[in-house]
Amino acid sequence: MSETNVDSLGDRNDIYSQIFGVERRPDSFATFDSDSHGDISSQLLPNRIENIQNLNVLLSEDIANDIIIAKQRRRSGVEAAIDDSDIPNNEMKGKSSNYILSQQTNIKEVPDTQSLSSADNTPVSSPKKARDATSSHPIVHAKSMSHIYSTSNSASRQAKHYNDHPLPPMSPRNEVYQKNKSTTAFVPKRKPSLPQLALAGLKKQSSFSTGSASTTPTQARKSPLQGFGFFSRPSSKDLHEQHQHHQHIQHNNINNHNNNNTNNNGAHYQVGSSNSNYPQHSHSISSRSMSLNSSTLKNIASSFQSKTSNSRKATQKYDITSNPFSDPHHHHHHHHSSNSHSSLNNVHGSGNSSSVMGSSSNIGLGLKTRVSSTSLALKRYTSVSGTSLSSPRRSSMTPLSASRPVMSASSKKPQVYPALLSRVATKFKSSIQLGEHKKDGLVYRDAFTGQQAVDVICAIIRTSDRNLALLFGRSLDAQKLFHDVVYEHRLRDSPHEVYEFTDNSRFTGTGSTNAHDPLMLLPNSSSFNSGNHSYPNSGMVPSSSTSSLNSDQATLTGSRLHMSSSLSQQKNPAAIHNVNGVFTLLAECYSPTCTRDALCYSISCPRRLEQQARLNLKPNGGLKRNISMALDDDDEEKPSWTSSVSKEDWENLPKKEIKRQEAIYEVYITEKNFVKSLEITRDTFMKTLAETNIISADIRKNFIKHVFAHINDIYSVNRRFLKALTDRQRSSPVVRGIGDIVLRFIPFFEPFVSYVASRPYAKYLIETQRSVNPYFARFDDDMMSSSLRHGIDSFLSQGVSRPGRYMLLVKEIMKSTDPEKDKSDYEDLSKAMDALRDFMKRIDQASGAAQDRHDVKLLKQKILFKNEYVNLGLNDERRKIKHEGILSRKELSKSDGTVVGDIQFYLLDNMLLFLKAKAVNKWHQHKVFQRPIPLPLLFACPGEDMPALRKYIGDHPDCSGTVIQPEYNTSNPKNAITFLYYGAKQRYQVTLYAAQYAGLQTLLEKIKQGQAAIISKTEMFNVTKMSDRFFDYTNKINSVTSCDGGRKLLIATNSGLYMSNIKRQQNKDHRHKSSAFFSTPIQLVQRNNITQIAVLEEFKSIILLIDKKLYSCPLSLIEAEGNGTSFFKKHHKELINHVSFFAEGDCNGKRLIVTAHSSSHSIKYFEHEHPLLAEKNGSGSGNKKSLKKKITEVIFDSEPVSISFLKANLCIGCKKGFQIVSISQNAHESLLDPADTSLEFALRDTLKPMAIYRVGNMFLLCYTEFAFFVNNQGWRKKESHIIHWEGEPQKFAIWYPYILAFDSNFIEIRKIETGELIRCVLADKIRLLQTSTQEILYCYEDYRGYDTVASLDFWG
């Protein structure tokens, strides 16, 4: 074959390889003369085109001839344009213009982003994929995408080397590459996700693509980020081109070793320079899935610098083998070619030389930019700086915890790494002191001032430069960590500016790493195998997809190991915020060659100013962005009064009058701006949200109703107010005054009160929609970036701050108003000022109440009860959260200040609540840790032990829960606090620990205040001691009753019957109150076990129950002279035997005595006969049955436990429920209707019904466990509550609107209608003695063992 044919065949093969990506196989059919086809007759032509013989050869030959002729014409012209510094001369001749187009075409440089059509959609299980994965060979460099779209010289060289040097044989699958210091190993890189800070800029570029990406062959499971196009795998064509380029690199190495004798002992290795024999390329196996412009790359590079100067200098002094990231054991691949080996040795030079990719490469849309030696995309993961070649050299590494900001004015180590916004934000939230601050007349709770914020940031980043701290704070403000309470401006270093956290969350869980943190994507495996290569001691998962901006694999591996150890050693404290990013002013340069004395190549290096100062260089201005500011369209109104009128109108006025006119004009101009903002809110926000689907249709109406509540009312009033001000302002250049206008419109400002009160809930709705509704979040962001320059929060907050501005504006006018000259206006302004003060007070009250109510509602949504539900009364509109904080079940060590307690407590105005946060399916649930403790039953003591409560409880009659001090004055170094729940059914004691002693003292003080407030609200219950130190444990009081019009008291005890006189006297402390006391009791009858007593004064009889026998005795016993025991024996009458207890009362117009008999499950009742009637009927005094009529007995199926009197019937409480007994019909039936399914809880046999009371047209049934309402048909009242007792009461008393339940340890006082516990009176062994309309008598045992009689006086 001739030389021409040889060249033609080579060009054909070259073209075929470039088009199809594989080597053309030899022809398997015989060739023929291409010119002879013209002689073929039409009769010999086949009917189908696919049947034409050798059609493919004919077409390819014609195409090849056209291309070859075009190339030969342009070959001489293109050769002159080749860069001699990049490619050797012997390779340039005749190989530079391998265009595959017959006509000269200008090809525009396009971004090297994979399109949807070029994405590799081959299934993972395809054999083709397996061949691609196994055919990958370790190479020194991989081509960047810039060479794919480069000039033809690279294509020519590529084709030549592909034809001259076939692919080497594949390595065995189990082959392990030997480690060698002198060879450069390249590990296939895993493509990390782009930094979050750069994603926003990338998405705005037209070249940003999120094409479908398949999983890597070595990893069958799909990565979480591959669905977003962050990870991609190369196509088969890319892998084939990598082998071609590998051979191309080896051929260049041979030529460099033979023809170039340059001694490379310098400190830098420059790719693409005149001294380098390597072509331009970056480290990439496949094409990038993202395209970056220069500004985005600059932002990424400047945002992820993480190395300090001191640590860099220290680590660079280490030996080569001391760095684990540059250790030869980390290089897992090397080349088999000795030529490549020697060439690399020649290039690298000495082992301590620093290597930097200093050349320019085409990135994105053809923009020239520097390629860093370290992957920019990895800067968020690590602080390790590596080189672009994995040669054995030192690699500096700086842990995050050891970083120090360059600009810090203090030499102390910062508390956290100041460049990471997330860590500083977490420390900021835990360090800032929240409190109440006032702005524009409104009080904001859980807020802080701008000066406080700057102080805390200065302390965190260890700097005295407040401007730097202010810039840092505004970075946190920009990411919505906190905001101005009125959304007017950014952070300011002022004690008068008030800010609050954006989340305003009261629920802070335990510290944990965010599941969405990109750091969690790092693998933690120690070794793995992939394909036919082994990766020992590596924490990296190999992947065929990579980024063209990645660094060497040693850096990646080292960074992963470093960050994995950092994650295992450092626990991020509780930080519920979305702040993320890098503060570049405090970050360190990522370049390993950047020192304090050498100018860094990067223009955005943080040390650049310092380096320029050291080198005496003049700083260059650099490129500047042309920022176009949106101008206000309304330029009609002048900013000041003097500019709005002519100079002749004000030049002769005194300065005080000018100042007054400026203040009046400010009222007018600010009111106009406020009305304009209301119009924008109405026309832009309300209308858009109402007419579009930004808010879902099911909640749209409710959202607009509450978020924009009272906007139209305010606009209606202020529009007329503005019109009045406008007319006054235009009536004369010099306004005489506006006091009358302000005073006239203040009564119409009432919608502001309702508007301010609706803001907490409106803010909650907005934040909820912003977090769950991406359309609403985008809408709000679009409004902020539009000409409005403010979001919905800013516009809605103006209505909150406007009433306070009125006060400030009126006050400013009064300062400049002469009381003598402008007397009328000054008086109007004074009246308006007083009216505005009252108005602001009502706004503060409404705002505070609304905020309290909103906080309680949020708390109600979070609470989850583990076992028994407890009614916390959170539906009460008056419920408030007094204090909250975090405690721990374990002691917090002094050294570990970042440990967060696991118990969240909430001190309400009625009880103390403990919650424990737990994350379930990414939702923070707050489970009740212990049963909530009502404040009247709460005892708190600083320390780990609770003193004995007997002397505290029995010391005074009105004892209730309180804060007590330990018995011994010992220190409390552990900051422990012990809580005791003084309940009957749920008594428990728990000890928790506070982080700080001040927090412990604050909690105890808040508990004291809450308990004192409860007692002050129930002053109508006067608990006084009437008798003590007489009845000891051998002579217990069983029952008492009053007689002689309440002046005498009969006391039944275990040893007999006593009588005492009741005396009253004025209280010295409160003259309008009187206190009662008993005289020394006198024994009337000496009989043992008198368990119950009753006096029937109208029948002049005393009823006694002695040893289960019911006796009657004349009332004259109390006036009998001499021994009362003998008088009782002579005049008493035995009525009934085997009586468990009895009761007397009026029923159906009769005075009945009812006795209960437990043994026979029955009751007996009879009517007591008047003694005078008995004497008239001739009954003798010795007749035993003279005082009673016929005895009626009613038998039940269970034991009777209580007796209650209704108007016409008896209600007997049996163990199986209440039974109604008809006196007239002598029959009984169940009170509760079993047809009511809502009463299943009250139909248990274990319940003990104790009392029934008529309340209106309903009946209150009291059991030992609970109480509830039923109607006269025995059905439960609809939507009625159930009162659950804290104790197990045996007796009840009612004093509307309160119900009193007597347990042996305390008395519960509750509201009948709501069941709310308002007061508890604590004592030991309490027994109810007597109830009346004025007072209740009960007795208890004091700490000395004496029975003490006390009175609950309702009238006082």
UniProtKB/Swiss-Prot annotation:
A GO molecular function held by the record: guanyl-nucleotide exchange factor activity
Domain CNH: from-to ranges: 1034-1336
Sites of Phosphoserine modification: S76, S193, S223, S566, S628
Skewed-composition ranges (Basic and acidic residues): 235-244
InterPro entries, per the entry: CNH_dom (IPR001180), DBL_dom_sf (IPR035899), DEP_dom (IPR000591), DH_dom (IPR000219), PH-like_dom_sf (IPR011993), PH_5 (IPR041675), Rho-type_GEFs (IPR052233), WH-like_DNA-bd_sf (IPR036388)
Leader peptide range in chain numbering: none
In-chain residues carrying the UniProt-annotated modification N-acetylserine: S2
Biased composition, class Polar residues, residue ranges: 109-125, 147-157, 204-221, 271-281, 303-325
Keywords: Acetylation, Guanine-nucleotide releasing factor, Phosphoprotein
UniProt feature, compositional bias: Basic residues: 329-338
Gene Ontology process terms (BP): establishment of cell polarity; positive regulation of endocytosis; positive regulation of mitotic actomyosin contractile ring assembly; regulation of cell wall organization or biogenesis; regulation of fungal-type cell wall organization; small GTPase-mediated signal transduction
Domain DH: residue ranges: 659-846
SMART domains named among the record's database cross-references: CNH (SM00036), DEP (SM00049), RhoGEF (SM00325)
A Pfam family per the record: CNH
Gene Ontology cellular-component annotations: cell division site; cell periphery; cellular bud tip; cytoplasm; incipient cellular bud site; mating projection tip; nucleus
Biased amino acid composition, Low complexity: 250-265, 282-291, 339-362, 383-401
Chain residue ranges for the region called Disordered: 74-94, 109-175, 202-291, 303-362, 383-409, 531-571, 626-645
Protein task: Stimulates the exchange of RHO1 GDP-bound form into GTP-bound form.
Protein's UniProt name: RHO1 GDP-GTP exchange protein 2
Origin organism lineage: Eukaryota, Fungi, Dikarya, Ascomycota, Saccharomycotina
GN (gene name): ROM2
